[in-house]
Amino acid sequence: MADNTPTTANDFLNGAAQVAKSPEEIAKENDLLPKLITHLDRHLIFPLLQFVADQDEEPSPEITKAKFELLKKTNMTDYVASLYCEIEGVEEPPKEYATKRQEILQRLEIFGQESEKITDLLGREDVVTGLRSDKVANLEFLKKEHDVTIDMVNVLYDFGNFQYSCGNYGAAAELLYQFRVLSTDDDKVTAATWGKLACEILTGNWESAMEEVQKVKELIETKLFNKPVAQLNHRTWLIHWALFPFFNHEPARDVICDLFFSPAFINTIQTACPWILRYLTAAVITNRNRTRNTGQYQKQLKDIIRIVKQENYEYSDPVTDFIKALYLDFDFEEAQKKLSEAEEVLRSDFFLVAASENFVEAARHLISESYCKIHQRIDIKDLSARLGLNQDEGEKWIVNLIRDTRVDAKIDYKEGTVVMNHPPSSVYQQVIERTKGGFFRTQVLSAAVAK
């Protein structure tokens, strides 16, 4: 038999206390690190682990162990040895680390000797000017004029990989570039292109990284044309790698937004990695403050609303839920709640932490614009609360909003309201107003029945 005991105020308060989550709980629940690392090279994972470590006041043994496991198979022996000492609480690492260090130094010297001739040639202007876009012709030219062999070219690839494993990303990028100029081995050229992209990311050369993103995209489209599963997997990896320039290089924002919204890539996101919607949504929202092309911005906003709606059953977090609350449910209180949660999520996300303030600013604009569209007279105190601001801050915010957007409105400081001079009601507004009216009548009837 159902329990018909009336719900008391204390029950509501206790329920609210159980539902309320701390910022740390919100961040932990929405941590994407486990999903991201499965699509990143181990060297690209390291900055994400370091970010987590930097957020902790005290060094975390778990993060230190994770770093050790991540890098122990690389040639970064000195750093791995220091991690070992930290984990085990000793001052000196085992002798095997010193032995491995010596082996690595010897191998570097051998690689240097084996590649010296070809790297010197590629550094000479007279040789470089003789090269053409035809790799076969280039090899013939170098073989005929300078006795260069295929083995010499392949040494560049092996040396580049070795330098990468040592953490010498600048040197690795140059070697892989030189290899790519000469090699006709498709598989190795593809691997070298991915490797150079990783190097440019890890050295923060964002313009070069964007060039490599485009090269990898072209390789996926051409070399894997008849392999749809391989294309899907490679696009998934590229999407994750592209997050680095996406939020670190301002000119990359529009380019990567366009890339992610392209049919092949948005299909990949929806099929293989829907959590990327967090980053695409954040990028679209923050674009409000930086784009001059309002038409493009409105299109991207409509697209992200549609995609969030489609994928809500598959993936959601406070960032995508903000879009859902504001544009699909028209629930301003829920939108404000999700904005507060989204701010915590962004602050704990390696890729989005630098965009958190711009995101909140742009999101408040979107709430204000939507709220103003469906109300004739707006209480400043009420709107301020919906924006998470006090009344003074809210008043300044609304003044700036009216000035920046040139909306036709007047502030009545005496009444503490904003009067909107709307054009004749749109269908959108009529539906909202009728819904509000129906909700009000339902409340009145419920109150009457309760009496």
UniProtKB/Swiss-Prot annotation:
Keyword Zinc-finger part of the UniProt annotation: no
GO cellular-component term (any): eukaryotic 43S preinitiation complex
Gene Ontology MF terms in the entry: translation initiation factor activity
Subcellular location: Cytoplasm
Keyword match Magnesium: no
Domain of life per record: Eukaryota
UniProt keyword annotations, A-Z: Cytoplasm, Initiation factor, Protein biosynthesis
Single GO biological process annotation from the record: formation of cytoplasmic translation initiation complex
Any single Pfam family the record assigns to this protein: eIF3_N
PCI domain boundaries: 245-425
Main location: cytoplasm
PROSITE patterns, per database record: PCI (PS50250)
Subunit structure: Component of the eukaryotic translation initiation factor 3 (eIF-3) complex.
Role, per record: Component of the eukaryotic translation initiation factor 3 (eIF-3) complex, which is involved in protein synthesis of a specialized repertoire of mRNAs and, together with other initiation factors, stimulates binding of mRNA and methionyl-tRNAi to the 40S ribosome. The eIF-3 complex specifically targets and initiates translation of a subset of mRNAs involved in cell proliferation.
Family listed: Belongs to the eIF-3 subunit E family.
Protein name: Eukaryotic translation initiation factor 3 subunit E
Gene that encodes it: int6
